[in-house]
Every structure is written in structure tokens, then in C-alpha cells.
Amino acid sequence: MSPPRQRKCVIGLGMACLDQLLLWADTSAPVQGNRLIACQWQGGGPAGTAMVTVARLGGRAEIWAAVGDDWIGDLILRGLAQERVDTSQVVRVRGGRGTHMIACIDQPTGERHFYRGTEYVHSGRPVGDLKRLRGAGCLLVDGTRPASELRAAREGRRLGVPVVADVGWWTRERPAVLTHVDYAILSEHSARSLAPRGAAGKTARRARERASAEPLDLRMICQAVRGMGPPRVVITLGARGLVYLDGERFGRMKAFRVKVVDTTGAGDVFHGAFCWGLVAGLALEKNLEFASAAAALKCGHIGGRAGIPTRRQVVRFLSEHAGQ
């Protein structure tokens, strides 16, 4: 059965940027003698990619962000507008550059490493008109603008607008925002930041290496995050799927098996598809499945934007992979 159509607007607050994508034969090898297979430029950013996903799926999307008044900012806005994302709440920062990110992609695995090409653009004032939250279907905050997202999440909660937090990395500002969040979606990296630390006496580097090799108590981490406010918590685990906590129910979901070309933007596409499904009225498990399918389809293409699927493509993919 096809999911219902999404009608209310999804608002994404955070970063929109321009990605320079470099596909290497082997990112672990020295640059000298290595082979650059492809180079592309695409729009990116957690909130930016998520809102393009909403639009590709047939929903209404609006982004609250800040970009420079340079050529990079022009390209960012042009790309969003071409995808029918409302950019009326994007602040142009005078003298600002970018934001521009560089992604080095490993061809054998599809994994990538990010480097900041230009400084993150800061706005001297909060982004977004809070009045626009009235009647919105969902608010997504990506963690890149703590003051603005706390202000918006608090107002969204007051108005009864579902608030989704992209917790791709953990910062000291996140707990304050999570008190106003309905759905917290953590990356595995962020989840590891909340795991118990290694034994005293280890160097910081050795402690990090040990932590990355140890299995996580995912249920405990979900419960810890829920204790900060969000009644529903999701931890995405890449090729290992995801886990979720809905009230007292703890569940797991496998990832779809696909040929991975590039994982850039997969999490952002997941967040955008999840917001679309939330507004469309999908039940939590169906929504997680829908978002996982959208992210899997994206992984078959270079970059975070080129592979974002349409609603029809996701529905067909789910039909073909039923029971996987």
C-alpha cells in the first residue's frame, strides 16, 4: 500500500552548504599514486539535504539557515529553489563565505571523510520567523545553530508541532534542546559519545580507540536520551540497521541490502524522509522502514543530493524488498 500524501509544511532549521565530492580509488593510500575517479559539486548540509528529500517525496519544505553573500551562497540558494524548497527564511550574511564542505569518498566501501572548505556561516540574529511554525507539520533541527533551534523547538512544542532532532554529534547544548523534542534520532557516533568511558589512566586517544571497538548498550543509551525529554529515540547504525525506543518498547530493524557507492547524506535523507512520513501519518515502524528505504536508495549514487529518491521510487523499492 502506498503511504498517504504529505500536505503540511516541514521546516528544517540548520545548515545548507555546497559539497565538493571527491571519489578516490582508496582513501587509505597516499595521494601520490592514488587515483581520483570522480569529482562533483552538489548541494548539501544536514537540514538542506533533509528538506530536499521532503520536496522530492512530494511534500512541502522550508529551510531556516544562513549562507554567505558570495558565489557559494548563490549556488546553495539556487539549488534549493530548483528543488522547490522555500528559502524565504534563509539569511544572507554580508561578507560571509560559503559554507563549503569537502567529502573524500572511498570507492571500495562508499565511506567518506568530511573537511570544512570554508568557515561555517554565523548569523548575528536567530534564523526563522517563529510565526511560520503555526500550522507546520514538523520541525527538524540539525544541531548546527543551537540558539536558534532551542528558540524554535520551544515554540514548536508550545504549538503542538512535532519536533525532530538530528543528533549526528553530541554537544553540550543538546540536552537543553532535547527537553522540547518529540523524536531524537542519533547517529552511532553520537551514541558512542554517551556510552560509559574507558578505564581511568588511559590516554584520550587509547580511550577513544577502545570505545570504538566495544559494543554499545543501545537500550541503555536510548533510555538515557529519553530521560532528557524525547519520548521516542532512534539510533541509526548504518549497514547494521537501527534500534528504537518507543515508550517502553525497544525494537530493532535491519538495513536494506544494497550496493553502496557513497554514504554521503544518507543520514540526512533518512531524517527528511522520516519527517515526511511523520506528517503523512505513518506509524513509527512503517515510518522507520520508509526512511531506511529512502536512505538505502541514496547510497547508490555519489553525493547527498543526486540520489534522493521520489516517493514512487521508495514505494517500488519497498515492494521489491518486502520481507528482507
Residue ranges and their predicted role:
Residues 138-220, 240-242:
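Conserved beta-alpha-beta core of the PfkB/ribokinase-like small-molecule kinase fold
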Residues 55, 81, 157-158, 226:
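Anion (oxyanion) recognition and catalysis
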Residues 92-93, 103-143:
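Conserved phosphate-binding/catalytic loop of the ribokinase/pfkB sugar-kinase fold
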Residues 1-66, 71-75, 82, 108, ...:
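Glycine-rich phosphate/adenosyl-contacting loop at the front of the ribokinase-like
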Residues 79-95:
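A glycine-rich helix N-cap at a beta->alpha junction
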Residues 1-12, 35, 198-324:
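Conserved phosphate-binding/catalytic region of the ribokinase-like
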